[in-house]
Amino acid sequence: YIYTQ
């Protein structure tokens, strides 16, 4: 899982 902004 990867979360970026």
Swiss-Prot record:
The keyword Secreted applies. This is Phytosulfokine-alpha. GO terms for molecular function: growth factor activity. Keywords: Growth factor, Secreted, Sulfation. In presence of 2,4-D, stimulates proliferation of the cells, but does not stimulate differentiation into the somatic embryos. Belongs to the phytosulfokine family. One of its GO terms (cellular component) is extracellular region. Signal peptide: none annotated. It is found in: Secreted. Sulfation is important for activity and for the binding to a putative membrane receptor. The modification Sulfotyrosine is found at residues 1, 3. It comes from the Eukaryota.
